[in-house]
């Protein structure tokens, strides 16, 4: 009888310890996510950059090996893609190069269209652009008024979005490697998120489409300066082709020596 009692006492102790340890692990993981979200909030709060020309005066990640006469360049890229079953059907892409030395922003707007019935039948067009007084203008004449208006009114989420609102979602997972400063955020966003609303309105995406988000980049999560980052939005609707919006901001510092 005594041995039987000891057995149950030991079992109860093991269960209690397991519950306490599991609870501590859960709280530790929850606290880590809160801490990482706070760090990402510092990074994302440096946006929006409403005037792209202010990037002339903004430095990216620091590197002591570079000299003062290095060529500093920001690259801003966005793309809107319609993807069928393992194939790209349509893509519109804007790429801008912000030269901090010459104080010039140049780039191109590309369109790619693939025929769903004939994979070899694709159309690619490219339109050179530049930015003057924070407005995108063509460097060559474009006769299509609708396309011209579409490109000239183009804005990046880093200009007009509310990136910190992404962190309000309860369905997010954030990881950060302090050794490399690489971070990754992934999860789902509701239709009420202002960035989701803006993209759906801009690209005529179905209102009921579900949205997944992914954010990748390099940062110490202290928000000291703008860092390289890539942002992805995945829109899915039953029976519809998937729509992907990508946007990236990268900094390139090339030594002349």
Swiss-Prot record:
Record's GO cellular component terms: plasma membrane
Pfam families hit by this protein: DUF576
UniProt keyword annotations, A-Z: Cell membrane, Membrane, Transmembrane, Transmembrane helix
Main location: membrane
Family annotation (InterPro entries): Csa, Csa_sf
Keyword match Cell membrane: yes
Keyword Transmembrane helix: yes
Family to which the UniProt record says this protein belongs: Belongs to the staphylococcal tandem lipoprotein family.
Name assigned to this protein: Uncharacterized protein SAUSA300_0205
